[in-house]
Amino acid sequence: MPSFDVVCEPDMIELKNAIEQSNKEITNRFDFKGSDSRVEQKDEALILFGDDDFKLGQVRDVLINKMAKRNVDVRYLKDDKTETISGDKRKQTMKIQKGITSELAKKVVRIIKDSKIKVQASIQGDAVRVTGGKRDDLQETMALLKKEVTEAPLGFNNFRD
């Protein structure tokens, strides 16, 4: 039986490239000369550094623009906390969302069941497995989920025939 998994994971290679491009632009921009502004990746989080709130906002804008150019959805990032380091310097932590939350998984299953498409959905850890009799039904389900679920970026992998 054909099946696929609904997941919520960013392309980590593209995200890393976006971070590197952001840091390169920040070091080359005139308004950041002499500044200690940068973006770092630590495990499942991004840490943005800026000399003040304005520069921190500029660093965030540069990162979001670079992510958009590399087709990495900005909804993968969740604002965590902003803290003052030393003096006026600011640091903001942004968590990278990986995996589907249980509420979102339940919503995906409910959308699939309410659609009356002849497929079955089951929650498996941080993914939702969708199985069906025909490939066309699975493709219809993918289109439905892309249209209906807007609060989180969904991806589809493990497409088996």
Swiss-Prot record:
InterPro entries, A to Z: DUF520 (IPR007551), UPF0234-like_C (IPR035571), UPF0234_N (IPR035570), YajQ-like_sf (IPR036183)
Disulfide bonds: none
Key words of the record: Nucleotide-binding
GO cellular component, one term: cytosol
MF-aspect GO terms: nucleotide binding
Keyword Nucleotide-binding: yes
SUPFAM superfamilies: YajQ-like
Family: Belongs to the YajQ family.
HAMAP family referenced in this protein's UniProt entry, alphabetically: YajQ
Biological role: Nucleotide-binding protein.
Name of the protein described by the UniProt record: Nucleotide-binding protein Pnec_0318
Organism annotation: Polynucleobacter necessarius subsp. necessarius (strain STIR1)
